[in-house]
Amino acid sequence: MIKNEQEHFMKEALKEAKKAYEKLEVPVGAVIVKDGKIIARAHNLKETKYDTTKHAEILAIQKASKKLKSWRLTDCEMYITLEPCSMCAGALINSRIKKIYIGALDNKTGAAGSVLNLFDDYTFNHKVEVEKGIMVEQCELSLIHI
C-alpha cells in the first residue's frame, strides 16, 4: 500500500481518537478498510458505556462484521492509533483480519510486541500481518492527556 493511503486512513483513525478524547475516553480510534474504502470506524467507549470491552478495535470489528454480514474479515485491514491490547489482538486474530497498521506503541498493555506479541504466535490458526510506525508522532500526541 502507498504511504499516502496509509496516512489517509490513519488520519481517519485519529479523527475517531479525537471523538473519544472529547468524551473523556482513552483517545484511541480505529478504521477498517476493504478494497480501499472505509467500511467501519470506531473509538473507545469504555467509560461512556461502562463496559471494559468497548475498545475501538472491538467496536470497529462489530460494525464491519455487521456491514459485511460475516464475522470473517479476511480481505480487510485495520488502522489503529494505539497498539492493541491482548483482548483486541485476540479479536483481530479471530476475525481473520488480513493486516493491521499501528500508530503509537503501548508499553503498558501492547500485545503486538511492546509487552507481548500475540501476532507472532504461530499456534493460532490465523496470522495477522502487522505494520508499525504509521504517523507515530501524531498518534502519540493524541494520547498526551492520559
Where do the model's predicted regions map?
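Zinc-dependent deaminase
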Residues: 1-23, 71, 84-144
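Short beta->alpha transition motifs characteristic of CBS
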Residues: 39-46
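Histidine-centered active-site/metal-ligand motif
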Residues: 43, 55, 126, 145
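Residues at secondary-structure transition points
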Residues: 4, 27, 47-55, 83, ...
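Residues that line or immediately flank small-molecule/substrate-binding pockets and catalytic motifs
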Residues: 46, 80, 104
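Helix-adjacent hinge/juxtasegments
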Residues: 54, 58-93
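Short beta-strand scaffold segments in enzyme catalytic cores
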Residues: 28-33
